[in-house]
Amino acid sequence: MPIVLLIVIGMMVASWILSGTIPTMTYYGMKLLAPGQFLFLSCILCSVMSVCTGTSWGTVSTLGVALLGVAMGLGIPIEMTAGAIVVGSFFGDKMSPLSDSTVLAASCARVNLLDHVKHMYYSTVPAMLVSLVLFFVLGFRFKGGAISGVDYDEILAGLDASFNLSLLTLLPPIVVLVLVLMKKPAIPTFGAGIVVAFIIGIVTQGADPIEMLNAMSKGVSMETGIPIVNTLVNRGGIVSMLDTIGLILSAAIFAAPMRASGSVNAIFEAVKKVAKTPTQFMVLALIMQPVLLVATTSYFVTMPVTGELAADAMDEMGYSRLNLSRMMEDGGTVVCPLIPWGNTGAFITATLGVTPYEYFFYMPFIWLCFVFDMLSIVTGIGLKKADGSMVTPLFKRKAS
């Protein structure tokens, strides 16, 4: 199931690029930028792009790089800008049903993908709101400046010259959004998004059907004449997902012998012995996410291991595995940028030129997701039972 989803996602990203959908959203999103709200809008813009594409790395390395150039021209500290970029990018990586980490967490916890996304609202929404308030307040320091930057102008000009930017190109994400709201299955929903984008690409961009099919297989490959725009649009396709699929298979191969050898069971029994109550068990399961991540540097390893450790235990305790899948993301996916020696932390430092230590305090979303998830476990707010009902919050239990 997750491998099929990743294949469909790769096809959809490519089709949305050639249909002009992603270029249109990027173009008009960048037009909204204003100096006083630069950090605030940069975070939102990165969120939109990351949600639509499902890739934090792609957002950071394309739009993030452009926004960093704009920030330098405005005299806005790059660590603040990096924080806004990382928060927006990983909000999308966490909440987008197109994201490999989202698919992996749902798969390892054995829960429905879209139900998993909705259950993360309890920790993600408050963490994101705090972050947006921070960026909005910081923006008051930079009012009165003017947007400048070669990369910014080049992207706008390159997108405008290479694509027919129109509201019609926004139809594919609208169709997907409607189907998601109607609670349709993920694969047919994304399939509809691909079909609509395929038609829109032919109608609005004059795209060759054979070229679109080829791009959905091998990824988009076009020359706009502007290197940074090439980086923005040349991605997607089934081939782009092969590394991720390989990692998922490798993680599964890694987790299987751990369980077969008894290693997983030993850890599982140790956790159960320490945890005297379901609350204690879930607290330990959440804490295990960053601990395992620091050791392995990859949630492709930590999520399958956690799924092996805790999924059945959640059933036995009468709690929904959606709580577990949320823990995997709050303690795993969004923690990756904080680990300097991890792939994600090293990638961000190399791309934006800022270390995790420098942007730590400007990305509260990253660590507040963990905090709000912990509060959910302790208080019972936003915690779901195995039968689908919500746990009675602690303060109501005391009152009664």
Region annotations inferred by a language model:
Residues 1-6, 122-130, 136-250, 391-400:
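Hydrophobic transmembrane alpha-helices of multi-pass small-molecule transporters
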Residues 1-26, 137, 141, 166-181, ...:
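N-terminal alpha-helical transmembrane segments of multi-pass membrane transport
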Residues 1, 75-79, 105-117, 260-263, ...:
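Juxtamembrane helix-boundary/capping and inter-helix hinge elements in multi-pass membrane proteins
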Residues 1-72, 224-312:
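Membrane-embedded alpha-helical segments and adjacent helix-loop junctions characteristic
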Residues 36-49, 75-94, 280-293, 317-338, ...:
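Alpha-helical transmembrane segments of multi-pass membrane proteins
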Residues 11, 44-48, 69-70, 132-133, ...:
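Alpha-helical transmembrane segments of multipass membrane proteins
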Residues 94-97, 105-157, 345-400:
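Juxtamembrane and boundary regions of transmembrane helices in multi-pass small-molecule transporters
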Residues 3, 39-44, 82, 125, ...:
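Hydrophobic alpha-helical transmembrane segments
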